[in-house]
Amino acid sequence: MVQIHGIRRASADAKYRQMTGQPVKPLILKLCLPAVISNLVTTAYNLTDTFFIGQLGTAQSGAIGIAFSIMTVMQALGFFFGNGAGNSMSRELGKQNNERASRLLAVGFAGAVLSGLVIATIGLLTLRPLVVMLGSTSTIAPYAVQYLTPLLVAAPCVCGSFALNGLLRYQGQSTFGMIGLVSGALLNFLLAPLFIFVLHLGIFGAGLATAICQTVSFTILTTMSRKFGVMKLSLRNCRPDVLLMREVAGGGLPSLIRQGAGSISVTCVNIAANPFGDAAIAGMAIVMRIMLGANSVIVGLGQGFQPVCGYNYGAGLFARVKEGYWFCVRLATCVLVVLAVLLWVFAPQLVEIFRSDPAVVAVGVAALHIQCCTVILNGFNMMGNMMTQTMDRTGIASFLALCRQGLFLAPIVLILPMMFGVLGVEMAQSVSDVLTFLVTIPFMRRILHELR
């Protein structure tokens, strides 16, 4: 045991020297690459689900949009504990306080799994009225129930996977997180068509495949964290106190708000699209998945920056924090410009991949074109939110997280359709992105001034 402890101590010291001493730009690129790959593969398997289910019918495609709200809640809880504990953990590692970092790791993991168990229990007991409340039409609701049932059973593993990926990343070990997520996603590429078409399980088979793959990812991530993390995952270190829980809650609140607001906004989009029929719900569900893929690249870049930010902020190296922030903002904006052009040009073909119904395509293409005009602002918006979260500016980070998906989008998507019909649903996200950009500017000016 003494030898193992010594090895981990040496590993922690080496990681500290890497995070606080290596050139910032290459370091961020090295750390963000596994995160970007993880996000892209996860998005690809979400889109694969959308594609396969789209072959079953328009109502089944709409069910994916309903289920997305529940999945976002699971993500929110996983990110709350994973990012909440991870933010504080990276700062403690920057201060070389490894014992407290180990306790944060254990508390974050245990909290995520327990929250998933709560979601599973509540969801399974109230599933039918829940999907109706989330915007299902009478034709979509049965398929949403079928898809969500196995996913809710696996909710503890889903929440645990999201948390563990973040906890590994904040230790600077994003490659191991990538291995866990990519393994489950690749398995889904095989199981989804097998269950849906070969075993004739339909949309239930798609949900079952996703549940199995999330469980596999959880198992791999748990093993990786125990064997290869800078801090060993051990529930014996799960000794929460008031101050520790306050740190986790403060660090995770922006993630919870960001993902929770995302779930609310998806529900509001479904409710707003409901009067325009199944095609409108299905079209918006497809666009949300496509734009999630585009934004996942930028989220991956920010995830590479966060451990660098946490370590260096904890070590008092503020110039490195600022250098990393501006590098990520510029790179994210350039990437989004390229993606926006590609998505605009190939919008019809992209939507038709998932559903060839002309009504679905019309809604999807219009929404995709509008969102391409403003998606380039998300690099600045996301990097500001992720940096303030890592720096423990909980109030600012929580407010900025709430703006894009909650404070602005939720009311906008319910009001604009009253004036513009289905066009109001299609343009709501873009209006929200512009308002969020304008609000973020003064906050980031102040934060960057304080880092001088």
Question: Where are the regions a protein language model picked out?
Answer:
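Short alpha-helical transmembrane segments in multi-pass integral membrane proteins
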Residues: 1-32, 89-156, 187, 196-253, ...
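Alpha-helical transmembrane segments of multi-pass membrane transport proteins
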Residues: 26, 41-42, 78-79, 119, ...
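Transmembrane helical elements of multi-pass membrane transporters/channels
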Residues: 30-49, 150, 184, 213-217, ...
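Transmembrane alpha-helix boundary and packing residues in multipass membrane permease domains
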Residues: 35, 39, 50-51, 68, ...
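Helix-terminus/linker motif at the lipid-water interface of multi-pass membrane proteins
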Residues: 40, 44-62, 131-138, 194-201, ...
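Small-residue-rich hydrophobic transmembrane alpha-helices
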Residues: 61-121, 158-177, 283-347, 378-397
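Short runs within selected transmembrane alpha-helices of multi-pass transporters and secretion channels
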Residues: 82, 150-169, 177-188, 206-219, ...
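Transmembrane alpha-helical segments of integral membrane proteins
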Residues: 382, 408-417
